[in-house]
Structures are given as structure tokens and as C-alpha cells.
Amino acid sequence: GGRAMGRMLNWWGDTVVLMGVFPMIASDIHGHLRPVDQAYFRKTREARLGKTLEEAAASRDTAVEGFRNALTPMRLTLKTQPYLGGASPNYADYIMFGTFQWARATSPFRLLKEDDPVYAWREKLLDAFGGMARKSPGYAV
């Protein structure tokens, strides 16, 4: 049962969370790359997105609303318990948090509103383990 549930979380995290975030921050990631890597990144990511990095960035203020709505299962869970995994964080939390930490490391774009339970959850995980994630280089989002 646990592995099957883990696979579902992986797929949901990859298809909803990660692929929801990526178009909104792709242009910011490009800016962090070495010049020698930027052409390859642009070519392959624009092919994946079906638009230029600039077009993806231009629509992110609208796209973020759809992304936030897609987080409803997380939000509903976090309204009834402190972590996705229950009373304490577990794999479910870490697999989802990884995408938010990656976004924080590469983009100043605000994915979450401060009054969102998902924002509060992310804040707790940023402070977990002595604040290890928060101390890592990143933007204040």
C-alpha cells in the first residue's frame, strides 16, 4: 500500500505541481544558467512549452491562479492536519516541498499567497531541520 500511494504522490507531484510551476519560472531558470548552457535550455524548454520563455513568463500572472487552484487537494489536507503526512512531515511532504524549494532557488516569482495553508506549510518546512532549506540560497518568496 505505501509504495502504491508513493507512486500516486510522485505522479501528482510531477504532473500537477512540477509541471504547473515550470512554465512560470522557466525564464528565471534561464537567467541562472551559464551562457554556454542557455541556448540548449532555451531550445529544449521552448519546444516542451510550445512557446518562448518570454511568452511563458508574460502569462504567469494569469497561470498562477490556475496553479493555485490545482493545489486544492493539498490545501484541504492541510486544513485538517499540520502536514500532508499527518502530525509530522513524511515522504508526501518532502516530495511536494522539493518543487517549491527548487522554485525558490531559481525564481523570485510568488507562487503562493501568504494566507494560503500551503504557504504556511511551506514555511514550516523551510524551517525544518534547523532551517536548512531556508538557509539555502534562494529568493524570499
In which residue ranges do the predicted regions lie?
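Structural signal for well-ordered, non-membrane alpha-helices
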Residues: 14, 71-75, 126
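Alpha-helix C-caps/helix-loop-beta hinges
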Residues: 80-81, 97, 128
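Short alpha-helical "patches" and their helix-cap loops
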Residues: 24-42, 109-126
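A mid-sequence, solvent-exposed acidic-amphipathic segment
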Residues: 45-83
